[in-house]
C-alpha cells in the first residue's frame, strides 16, 4: 500500500475525541523509547491539549501516524522544550512523531515533516526538534539530516543525551 492509497494527511481539531487520543497514545507507546514514554492516558491527553498542531495519517478511519507540534509560550514542562524556548522567541517544536510499525518505511514521516516544514515557513518560524544520541537513534539522526536539519546544541541528562536540530 502506498501513500496515495491511504487517507490524506489531516490536521486534527481539538478537543480530540477519546478514540483519537487512544489511537495516538497507542502509537506513541509502541514507538517508545524513540519517542518519550507516557504510560498514563490522562498525561498524554494533557500533552495533546498543550500542542498547537496535530497532523495525522489515517488508513481508512484508523490513525496510523502522527506529529505533535508546540509553539512558544506553552506551559509544557519538558526540559527539551525549555531549552528550545531559551534559544528561540518564535518556533514550531516537534515534540514527537511516530508511525505505527507496519506502516514504517513508506515515506509517511517524510510527508508529515514536509507539511510541518511548509507550515513553519508560511508562519515565518523555524522547525525545531531533538533526537536521542544516548541511547543513539541512528535512524532518526539520518532522517533529520536527509530533511536538511542542522545541529543547534546538545544536552546530557541522567538517562539520555540529545542533539537539538533546526530546519529554517
Describe each PLM feature range:
Residues 46-56, 65, 70-72, 93:
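A short helix-loop-beta-strand connector motif used in the catalytic cores of GNAT acetyltransferases and
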Residues 3-26:
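A short beta-loop-alpha structural element at the N-terminal edge
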Residues 99, 105-118, 146:
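Conserved acetyl-CoA-binding loop-helix of GNAT-fold acetyltransferases
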Residues 34-60:
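Active-site rim helix/loop that mediates acceptor-substrate recognition in acyltransferases
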Amino acid at each position: 500500500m502506498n501513500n496515495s492509497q491511504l487517507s490524506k494527511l489531516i490536521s486534527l481539531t481539538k478537543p480530540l475525541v477519546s478514540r483519537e487520543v487512544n489511537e495516538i497514545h497507542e502509537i506513541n507507546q509502541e514507538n517508545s523509547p524513540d519517542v518519550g514514554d507516557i504510560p498514563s492516558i490522562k498525561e498524554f491527553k494533557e500533552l495533546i491539549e498543550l500542542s498547537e498542531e496535530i497532523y495525522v495519517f489515517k488508513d481508512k478511519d484508523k490513525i496510523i501516524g502522527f506529529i505533535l507540534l508546540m509553539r512558544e509560550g506553552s506551559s509544557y514542562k519538558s526540559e527539551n522544550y525549555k531549552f528550545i524556548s531559551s534559544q528561540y522567541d518564535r518556533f514550531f517544536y516537534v515534540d514527537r512523531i511516530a508511525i505505527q510499525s507496519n506502516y514504517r518505511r513508506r515515506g509517511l514521516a517524510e510527508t508529515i515533516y514536509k507539511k510541518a516544514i511548509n507550515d513553519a515557513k508560511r508562519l515565518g518560524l523555524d522547525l525545531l526538534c531533538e533526537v536521542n544520541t544516548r541511547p543513539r537513534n541512528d535512524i532518526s539522526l539520518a532522517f533529520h539530516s536527509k530533511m536538511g536539519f542542522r545541529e543547534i546544541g546538545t544536552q546530557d541528562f541522567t538517562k539520555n543525551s540529545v542533539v537539538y536540530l533546526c530546519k529554517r
